[in-house]
């Protein structure tokens, strides 16, 4: 969204941050804000690409949630590309950028660990030193530890979907358009919808929900018998009560919500063993809350 929209606003209360996942901690920062400044790409994708994390949501989903979560009046979201220019900005230059883009800025909302400028030299106190009013939100906790995007990614990587969902305040989900597979599932009586998605998930089998009902999903390369069906991890969703998805809307993105991890992905020696495991997975999915 153009920054010109913000220039027409009076008394802008601006939330700043990357907000990957828009988790419960982020929502504390967003509370009371009527505008958001965020980056489209993760700063580490420029600063140190080898350390850039797998993201919890794509940029358009993040912008949509930042606009609407916890507010009756949609927020203006100013999403910009993080570039080498931003990476090398002195803190005072970033302050000038804020004043230029948001001349009617009343207050900045941020988390306690938010940093800006080259080498993260700018802090919330830096903004105060330049005359800004700053609201620093306290960490939200889950258990004895602070909620963070990093902690959520770690939970998902371990298969602890329930913990991740608790910190997100919603079910972790991915969205994508179905792609054609090799038809193995159909031959076994368990047809799947296949999605090429990048997610910080442990490889394995999950209980999921979709707009078409409950499902069992395998995230991995599908090493059923012999060679893997996919070179990179793919999400294969079997809808346990059936659905002719092709007749519904085959080109429409499908949202898949994760309820819990069932088991690691594994290779089977024969078709009968695989079919028995599919039946057990379906039974577990039906009994899941």
Where are these regions (language model features)?
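Conserved beta-strand termini and adjacent loop/short-helix elements that scaffold enzyme active sites
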Residues: 1-3, 39, 79-82, 137-139, ...
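N-terminal catalytic cores of NTP/NDP-binding nucleotidyl/phosphoryl-transfer enzymes
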Residues: 3-60, 64
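A general structural motif
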Residues: 10, 33, 74, 104-105, ...
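Residue-level signal for inorganic ion chemistry
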Residues: 23, 66, 108, 164, ...
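Glycine-rich, Lys/Arg-enriched anion-binding loops that position phosphate/diphosphate groups
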Residues: 123, 130-224
């Amino acid at each position: 969204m153009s920054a010109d929209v913000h220039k027409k606003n009076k008394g802008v209360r601006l939330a700043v941050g990357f907000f990957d996942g828009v988790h419960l901690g982020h929502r504390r920062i967003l509370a009371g804000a009527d505008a958001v400044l965020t980056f489209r790409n993760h700063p580490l994708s420029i600063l140190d690409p080898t350390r850039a994390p797998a993201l919890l949501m794509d940029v358009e989903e993040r912008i949509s949630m930042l606009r609407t979560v916890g507010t009756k009046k949609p927020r203006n979201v100013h999403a910009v590309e993080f570039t080498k220019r931003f990476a090398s900005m002195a803190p005072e230059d970033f302050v000038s950028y804020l004043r230029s883009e948001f001349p009617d800025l009343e207050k900045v909302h941020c988390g306690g660990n938010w940093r800006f400028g080259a080498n993260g030299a700018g802090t919330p106190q830096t903004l105060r030193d330049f005359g800004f009013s700053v609201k620093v939100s306290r960490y939200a906790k889950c258990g004895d530890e602070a909620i963070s995007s990093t902690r959520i990614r770690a939970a998902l990587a371990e298969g602890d979907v329930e913990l991740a969902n608790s910190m997100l305040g919603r079910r972790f989900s991915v969205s994508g358009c179905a792609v054609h597979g090799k038809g193995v599932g159909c031959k076994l009586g368990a047809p799947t919808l296949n999605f090429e998605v990048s997610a910080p998930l442990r490889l394995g089998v999950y209980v999921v929900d979709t707009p078409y009902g409950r499902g069992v999903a395998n995230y991995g390369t599908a090493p059923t018998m012999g060679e893997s069906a996919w070179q990179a991890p793919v999400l294969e969703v079997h809808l346990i009560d059936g659905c002719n998805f092709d007749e519904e809307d085959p080109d429409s993105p499908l949202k898949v919500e994760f309820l819990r991890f069932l088991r690691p992905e594994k290779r089977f020696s024969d078709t009968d063993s695989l079919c028995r495991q599919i039946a057990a997975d379906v039974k577990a999915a039906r009994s899941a809350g």
